[in-house]
Amino acid sequence: FYQPDMTSRVAASMRLESRLRQALDAEQFVLHYQPKVDAASGVTVGFEALLRWQDPEVGLVPPGEFIPLLEESGMIVEVGLWVIHRALEDERHLRALGLRPGRIAVNVSARQL
């Protein structure tokens, strides 16, 4: 059954998908690294790479607002590859500085497997 708000929801979803494409092209996605700590020793043993969208118009967009649309649109595969490459580049950079970040965990979509 058609409801009047369906048109506006579809239009909003399409606008967001277009903005996500622009965000990828304009390098607005960033990774934040959350430490993984050994509970017994308190030692940081690695990091988890977390995808964030730094939108120049609205600031930091919560992942719950854009990751589901990346999944639905299929863009998650392209963005997921970007995440993997970025995490590897960041890890190489840290090692070049003489740091040892440990393991970096990257969450991937089932579509990427």
Predicted segments, located by residue:
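Bacterial c-di-GMP phosphodiesterase EAL domain
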Residues: 4-113
